[in-house]
């Protein structure tokens, strides 16, 4: 099976779109937030679509399984940095920081578990899929921030995603607890 297939191209597209929605975010034109949000939303949809196609067409690859969560993290962290800078307040920067810290910890944990050859591999948990969906919902709303209600929905979703972020991190740590304390 080829390493690079249509689902993998969609995942790569998600990574490639990050600098484009970042540049769009800073353009000094009235319609820039809407275009930035549309670009982010399209990238977010590819997250669902690439996995769906890979399973449906039986084109799952080890590279795709590795790249998909990395692409998610790159996209989410970039958007978190943008909204933290845009709102420039602790009540946005704090949850953004918590989410970024968790993502780095889990990526490092996955690398460590793979490096020690543990049988307790860290697959994607159902709670992580929900977390990613809520994060993308929050970030879509906050990048757009067209009116007060959209911002409120985005902030609420951001805080819900922080709770899901912490919960999923605890589950991952529980899965590898024996490796953490016995290695």
Curated annotation (Swiss-Prot):
Quote the pathway field. Phospholipid metabolism; phosphatidylglycerol biosynthesis; phosphatidylglycerol from CDP-diacylglycerol: step 1/2
Q: Which residues lie on this side of the membrane: Cytoplasmic?
A: 1-13, 83-87, 170-182
Q: Where are the transmembrane segments?
A: 14-38, 62-82, 88-108, 147-169
Main localization of the protein described in the UniProt heading: membrane
Q: Which GO terms describe its cellular component?
A: plasma membrane
| Localization | Cell inner membrane
In the record, the note on similarity to other proteins reads: Belongs to the CDP-alcohol phosphatidyltransferase class-I family.
Q: What does this protein do?
A: Catalyzes the conversion of cytidine diphosphate diacylglycerol (CDP-DG) and glycerol 3-phosphate into phosphatidylglycerol. Essential for the synthesis of anionic phospholipids, thereby playing a role in balancing the ratio of zwitterionic and anionic phospholipids, which is thought to be important for normal membrane function.
Identification of the protein by name: CDP-diacylglycerol--glycerol-3-phosphate 3-phosphatidyltransferase
Species of origin: Blochmanniella pennsylvanica (strain BPEN)
Q: Which gene encodes it?
A: pgsA
């Amino acid at each position: 099976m080829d390493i690079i297939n249509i689902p993998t191209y969609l995942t790569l597209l998600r990574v490639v779109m990050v600098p484009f929605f970042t540049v769009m975010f800073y353009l000094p034109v009235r319609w820039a937030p809407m275009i930035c949000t549309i670009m982010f939303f399209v990238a977010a949809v590819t997250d669902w679509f690439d996995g769906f196609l890979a399973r449906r067409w039986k084109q799952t690859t080890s590279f795709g399984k590795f790249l998909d969560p990395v692409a998610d993290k790159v996209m989410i962290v970039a958007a978190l940095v943008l909204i933290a800078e845009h709102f420039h307040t602790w009540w946005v920067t704090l949850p953004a920081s918590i989410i970024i810290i968790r993502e780095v910890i889990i990526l490092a944990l996955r690398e460590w578990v793979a490096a020690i050859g543990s049988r307790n591999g860290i697959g994607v948990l159902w709670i992580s899929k929900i977390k990613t969906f809520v994060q993308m919902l929050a970030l879509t709303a906050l990048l757009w921030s067209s009116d007060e209600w959209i911002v409120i929905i985005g902030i609420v979703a951001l805080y819900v995603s922080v709770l899901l972020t912490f919960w999923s991190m605890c589950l991952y740590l529980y899965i590898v607890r024996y490796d953490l304390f016995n290695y």
